[in-house]
From Swiss-Prot:
One Pfam family, short name: Mntp
Chain segments annotated as transmembrane: 3-23, 66-86, 106-128, 143-163, 168-188
Protein species of origin: Escherichia coli O127:H6 (strain E2348/69 / EPEC)
Name of the protein in question: Probable manganese efflux pump MntP
Keyword Cell inner membrane listed: yes
Family: Belongs to the MntP (TC 9.B.29) family.
Bilayer topology annotation: Multi-pass membrane protein
Molecular function terms, GO-annotated: manganese ion transmembrane transporter activity
Claim: Cell cycle is one of the keywords in the record: no
Length: 188
C-alpha cells in the first residue's frame, strides 16, 4: 500500500473517533487543550493497537472477528450513548449549579474501543495484503490523535452554544455511530 493510500486509510479510520470527540468536547464545560490532547492520546493509542490486534486475529481467525465486531461496537456505543442521554436529561434542571464532570480515563478508553473496532476489522483485512502493519497502525493512530483533539475543540465550541443539551447530543452522536456501523455491515 502506498503512502497516499495509507494516509487516506488513516484519516478515514479516524472519523468515528472525531465524531465521538466532538460529542465529548460538547459535554464538558470549556474543556482545556490538555483535556483535548489527553482524549486524542487515548483515542490515538487505542486506534493504533486495534489494527495490530485485528491483523494478528486475521492471521488466526478472521471469520469470527468479522462476524461479531459490528455487534460489539453497536452494543458498546448504544450503552455509552444511552448513558450520556440519561445524564443529559437528569442534569437539565441544574445546568449552572455545578460544573460538568470530566470524562474519566476508563470511560474514554471504552469509547475509544467502541469507535475503533472498525480499525480492528481493517487490520483483519490488512493481514491478507502486503502492508507494513506497524507503519499503517502508527499512521491510523496519529491521524486519530489529531482528529480527536480537533474534535474535542470543535465540541467545546458547540457545547458553549447549546449548554447541557450537549450531553444529549453527544449521546445521540454515539448511538448514531453505532447504528451506522450496524447499517454498513448489513447494507454494505
Amino acid at each position: 500500500m502506498n503512502i497516499t493510500a495509507t494516509i487516506l486509510l488513516a484519516f478515514g479510520m479516524s472519523m468515528d473517533a472525531f465524531a465521538a470527540s466532538i460529542g465529548k468536547g460538547a459535554t464538558l464545560h470549556k474543556p482545556k487543550f490538555s483535556e483535548a490532547l489527553r482524549t486524542g492520546l487515548i483515542f490515538g493509542a487505542v486506534e493504533t493497537l486495534t489494527p495490530l490486534i485485528g491483523w494478528g486475529m486475521g492471521m488466526l481467525a478472521s471469520r469470527f472477528v468479522l462476524e461479531w465486531n459490528h455487534w460489539i461496537a453497536f452494543v458498546l456505543l448504544i450503552f455509552l450513548g444511552g448513558r450520556m442521554i440519561i445524564e443529559g436529561f437528569r442534569g437539565a434542571d441544574d445546568e449552572d449549579e455545578q460544573p460538568r464532570r470530566r470524562h474519566g480515563f476508563w470511560l474514554l478508553v471504552t469509547t475509544a474501543i467502541a469507535t475503533s473496532l472498525d480499525a480492528m476489522a481493517v487490520g483483519v483485512g490488512l493481514a491478507f495484503l502486503q502492508v507494513n502493519i506497524i507503519a499503517t497502525a502508527l499512521a491510523i493512530g496519529c491521524a486519530t490523535l489529531i482528529m480527536s483533539t480537533l474534535g474535542m475543540m470543535v465540541g467545546r465550541f458547540i457545547g458553549s452554544i447549546i449548554g447541557k443539551k450537549a450531553e444529549i447530543l453527544g449521546g445521540l452522536v454515539l448511538i448514531g455511530i453505532g447504528v451506522q456501523i450496524l447499517w454498513t455491515h448489513f447494507h454494505g
